[in-house]
UniProtKB/Swiss-Prot annotation:
Part of the 30S ribosomal subunit. Forms a bridge to the 50S subunit in the 70S ribosome, contacting the 23S rRNA. SUPFAM superfamilies: S15/NS1 RNA-binding domain. This is Small ribosomal subunit protein uS15. The lineage of its organism: Bacteria, Pseudomonadati, Pseudomonadota, Betaproteobacteria, Nitrosomonadales. InterPro entries: Ribosomal_uS15, Ribosomal_uS15_bac-type, uS15_NS1_RNA-bd_sf. It comes from the Bacteria. One of the primary rRNA binding proteins, it binds directly to 16S rRNA where it helps nucleate assembly of the platform of the 30S subunit by binding and bridging several RNA helices of the 16S rRNA. Forms an intersubunit bridge (bridge B4) with the 23S rRNA of the 50S subunit in the ribosome. It comes from Nitrosospira multiformis (strain ATCC 25196 / NCIMB 11849 / C 71). Belongs to the universal ribosomal protein uS15 family. One of its GO terms (cellular component) is cytosolic small ribosomal subunit.
Length: 89
């Protein structure tokens, strides 16, 4: 099932830098992580859904690029974010 508007709003509230912040790398990575986790559950039941798998790979790539950007500009913020999200590295 897709990430709902309420779930997105909760993620934004949890990871925003300031009130009204929806575009910071932290928020974008957190939203992508929520969608990636949702799709990972989808693939447990729909193993042959290769079309959606391509979308998943695009999301993972976009998240990786955003994390690389964040690591270059704010290492402390990067480390905090991957720890909070439970990502490896």
């Amino acid at each position: 099932m897709a990430v709902t508007t309420d779930q997105k709003a909760q993620v934004v509230r949890d990871y925003q830098r300031a009130a009204g912040d929806t575009g910071s790398p932290e928020v974008q990575v957190a939203l992508l992580t929520a969608r990636i986790n949702d799709l990972a559950d989808h693939f447990k039941t729909h193993v042959k859904d290769h079309h959606s798998r391509r979308g998943l790979l695009r999301m993972v790539s976009r998240r990786r690029k955003l994390l690389d950007y964040l690591k270059q500009n704010s290492v402390e913020s990067y480390r905090t974010l991957i720890e909070r999200l439970g990502l490896r590295k």
